Amino acid sequence: MLLCQCSEREEKSDGYQLRKDISKMKSKNCVLVCVTPQSKCEQLIRSGSLIAQQYGVPLEVLSVFHERDGFSPDPAVLEDLYECAKNENAQMSVYFNDSPAILAAVIAKKKGAVDIVTGFPKERSTHFVFTLHTLVPDIQISMVDVDDNGKIYRMIPQEAQPHYEMVGAQGI
């Protein structure tokens, strides 16, 4: 696994090459953003929209709540996320399942995700990103640190690592 932080300039120049690579893979057709009911997740949707534009694919937004918790999210925040998704021309789906990483992996595979966008794991993490990467190691995961001006850190699939090393992405 290669984890790299990309500057805006690298993302733009790299996005062209990635878009060319993706056009060869016809079964791949979306960027999937995984959100929780927090207003900070609007940044994830906006970052996911930029990534989807680089790839030239649609944006999908996913939120998975634990069944055992019932419907407890703040409805105002959830409505704001729906509006943000709508403004970015994305569909937003909400599911109730006690295995959110497994469900996200299944949806990513079914929709042919080229990139999965998540928040950056903090202390007391649920290990969502690690589990997701274990389940779909062939899909890039972009973690957005909303507390650090939206910096994006990427978990690069093994098969794509030589390309990233050639274009100068630095491992962290």
Annotate each language-model stretch with its function.
Residues 46-48, 104-107, 128-132:
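A short acidic, amphipathic alpha-helical/loop segment
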Residues 1-12, 119-172:
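Gly/Ser-rich helix-loop-strand patches that form or flank binding pockets
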Residues 63-67, 97, 121-122, 146-148:
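Short, ordered loop/turn segments at secondary-structure junctions
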Residues 60-62, 91-96, 142-144:
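General small-molecule cofactor/ligand-binding pocket signal
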Residues 1-25, 88-116, 122-124, 150, ...:
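Structural beta-alpha unit
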Residues 22-75, 82, 86:
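Small/aliphatic-rich secondary-structure junction motif
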Residues 56, 89, 112, 137-140:
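Residue-level detector of structured alpha->beta connecting loops
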Residues 52, 85, 108, 134-136:
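A generic structural signal for well-ordered alpha-helical segments
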